[in-house]
């Protein structure tokens, strides 16, 4: 197979790790659990296999997609684990592990790729090397493992690797990062043991080295063994990059490790290990480059490798031998073939919202991608081309309207899109005014190119009325008219210094130097507006009525936003509902006790209160047209992933 586009000669060159022959430099790192459960029902397993099948057909070289938890009961009969991974432990002991893992391996090999699995033992919840808490976001006091329990775990690692090998996979990766038990032993912040498994680096490494040795004794020399390692710990008392490199040297010296998978961040921090759009593309790749300079081991780097061009640059600069790309492959399962052909403008861009993960982890919903409604649903039949196309009018050029217009045109309908503003994107336009959200403009630009290529007629500055829609004589009308700003029933909300956050971000209203932000939206809007105000040098106080900040923003994103706001001196108040706004005074009331408090010393009040569905046209037209639909924020104000998925479901029906 040719090496591909001349701009990507390094990315599409072959490479060898251990006995694994790789046709390009792209690894798809572990994320299989979010796309389906290979060990669950047959339907769940098929979702998992269908997801990977598409990416394998596209040319993936290495799928590290089977991430499995060890049995975390750790010798204690009847013990009930707690915390992350508690309900999904012990995959390797399942009676059908070999059969399902074997199907995964066979699928990869059938398409010319290698297949590896990752062994996870989530630590600190409740198992830990010492009594120190694993992170600062909870107070779960862990059980301190004794030496018999450590040996039990080492044996479990060896057994699990043997099961992986017996299923036909090419290798195993140990998860020594992101608050895994192995990392907790490595870290001076969480390991203060005084026996042979603590103290200096030799002691802190002992558990990991003994696990590796046990795996090698079980699997032999030809089975690939890799270590996924935090390059440094960006929190108080953790190890720095110099010590991380020394850990790498000692792993290399064993002669039993085939590669090092270099990452940054933890489950809860700033950064998290799934870095949101607050961070630059490949932000810590240069740190991986330090490891590559110091070691002979092949280096894999994962961390916001958001495009093929970023991946190429990382390889070309010598920062890594391979790159891990997960969310970029969520956004476009055909990224590899499009990049190989130089069709860069046809690749759906990942915009780093992390809603793909938060949907599952915060709300218990199915996996979904903000920019690609097909991701996670590959097992469903694709859209069917229509034999006789209809004329469809789509009103509204936000995420829902853009996706609907494109999908219906791809099905064979004739489509016109009306947008009342002079630009497409809807509320994404306002959100993109914050520098960490600039990736939103990439998605808007992608959709514009897509519509133009498909031949969708786009009419900007075109307001829709009941009469103009009827006059268009469309067979089908789709109303994606978005949401209006919600103005809660707060006394004084009409005062001239009370501003709407969206209007402030668009520059239509100007906030004073001292701002009180009324936060009555549960996702990113208050944090985004606060970030915008901070960038303008404003002094900001945020008032939330909820017991927690941004309750629908999950652990992988909240840290980055709060780190920025905290560093800027933003004051956050929770459990306070704004009752009354006056000139020079705001009255709040505690949602539980009813205790009133006053806020003073402000120039402006800015509202971040979400939206109210703009459904007036739908209500007036639904009885006057043969087929009219409503979707996106016009139906219920929610996030991008809901809008694009609803667009896809609607497109199936028309």
Regions found by a protein language model. Name each.
Residues 260, 291, 314, 326, ...:
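Hydrophobic, well-ordered secondary-structure elements that form the walls
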Residues 1-395, 399, 403-415, 423, ...:
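Flavin-dependent oxidoreductase catalytic cores
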Residues 417-453, 523-576, 635:
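Rossmann-like dinucleotide-binding cores of NAD(P)H-dependent redox enzymes
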Residues 59, 295, 318-319, 454, ...:
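Short, structured coil segments at secondary-structure junctions
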Residues 445-486, 579-588:
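Feature captures the FAD/FMN-dependent oxidoreductase FAD-binding
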Residues 351-364, 469-491:
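Helix-enriched interaction subdomains in cytosolic or periplasmic regions
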Residues 6-15, 45, 374-379, 457-463, ...:
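Short gly/ser/thr-rich secondary-structure transition/capping motifs
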Residues 386-420, 459-470, 480-555, 592-604, ...:
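Rossmann-like dinucleotide/flavin-binding elements
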């Amino acid at each position: 197979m040719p090496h591909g586009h001349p701009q990507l000669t390094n990315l599409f060159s072959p490479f060898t790790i251990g006995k694994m022959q790789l046709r390009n430099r792209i690894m798809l790192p572990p994320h299989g659990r979010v796309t389906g459960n290979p060990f669950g029902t047959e339907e769940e397993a098929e979702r998992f296999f269908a997801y990977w099948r598409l990416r394998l057909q596209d040319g993936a070289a290495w799928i590290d997609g089977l991430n499995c938890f060890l049995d975390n009961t750790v010798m204690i009969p009847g013990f009930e684990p707690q915390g992350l991974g508690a309900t999904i432990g012990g995959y390797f002991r399942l009676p059908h592990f070999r059969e399902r893992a074997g199907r995964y391996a066979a699928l990869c090999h059938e398409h010319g790729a290698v297949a590896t699995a990752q062994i996870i033992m989530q630590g600190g919840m409740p198992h830990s090397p010492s009594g120190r808490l694993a992170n600062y976001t909870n107070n779960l006091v862990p059980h301190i493992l004794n030496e018999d329990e450590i040996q039990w775990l080492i044996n479990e690692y060896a057994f699990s690797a043997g099961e992986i090998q017996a299923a036909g996979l090419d290798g195993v990766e140990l998860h020594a990062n992101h608050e895994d038990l192995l990392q907790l032993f490595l870290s001076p912040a969480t390991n203060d043991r005084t026996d042979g498994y603590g103290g200096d680096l030799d002691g802190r490494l002992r558990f990991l080295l003994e696990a590796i040795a046990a795996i090698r004794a079980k699997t032999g020399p030809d089975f690939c063994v890799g270590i996924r390692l935090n390059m440094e710990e960006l929190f108080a008392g953790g190890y720095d990059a110099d010590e991380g490199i020394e850990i790498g040297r000692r792993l290399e010296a064993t002669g039993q490790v085939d590669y090092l998978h270099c990452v940054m961040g933890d489950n809860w921090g700033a950064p998290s290990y799934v870095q949101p759009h607050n961070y630059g593309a490949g932000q810590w790749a240069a740190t991986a480059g330090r490891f590559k300079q110091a070691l002979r081991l092949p280096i894999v780097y994962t961390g916001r490798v958001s495009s093929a061009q970023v991946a190429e640059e990382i390889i070309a600069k010598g920062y890594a031998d391979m790159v891990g790309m997960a969310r970029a492959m969520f956004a476009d399962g055909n990224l590899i073939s499009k990049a190989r052909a130089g069709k860069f403008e046809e690749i759906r861009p990942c915009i780093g919202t992390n809603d793909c993960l938060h949907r599952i982890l915060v709300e218990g919903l199915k996996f979904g991608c903000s920019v690609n409604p097909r991701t996670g649903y590959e097992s469903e039949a694709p859209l069917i081309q229509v034999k006789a196309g209809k004329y469809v009018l789509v009103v509204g050029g936000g995420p829902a309207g853009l996706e609907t217009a494109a999908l219906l045109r791809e099905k064979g309908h004739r489509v016109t899109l009306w947008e009342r503003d002079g630009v497409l994107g809807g509320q994404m336009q306002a959100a993109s005014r914050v520098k960490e959200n600039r990736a939103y403009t990439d998605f808007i630009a992608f959709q514009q190119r897509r519509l133009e290529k498909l031949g969708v007629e786009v009419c900007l500055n075109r307001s829709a009325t009941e009469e103009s829609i009827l006059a268009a004589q469309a067979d089908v009308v789709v109303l994606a008219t978005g949401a209006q700003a919600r103005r809660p029933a707060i006394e004084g909300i009409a005062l001239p210094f009370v501003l709407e956050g969206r209007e402030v971000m668009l520059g239509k209203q100007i906030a004073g130097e001292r701002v009180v932000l009324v936060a009555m939206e549960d996702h990113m809007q208050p944090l985004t507006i606060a970030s915008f105000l901070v960038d303008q040098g404003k002094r900001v106080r945020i008032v939330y009525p909820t017991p927690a900040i941004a309750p629908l923003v999950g652990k992988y994103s909240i840290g980055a936003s709060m780190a920025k706001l905290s560093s800027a001196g933003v004051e956050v108040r929770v459990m306070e509902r704004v009752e009354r706004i006056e000139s020079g005074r705001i009255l709040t009331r505690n949602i539980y006790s009813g205790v009133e408090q006053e806020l003073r010393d402000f120039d402006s009040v800015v509202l971040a209160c979400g939206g109210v569905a703009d459904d007036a046209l739908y209500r007036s037209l639904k009885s006057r047209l043969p087929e009219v639909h409503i979707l996106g924020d016009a139906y219920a104000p929610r996030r991008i992933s809901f809008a694009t998925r609803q667009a896809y479901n609607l497109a199936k029906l028309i």
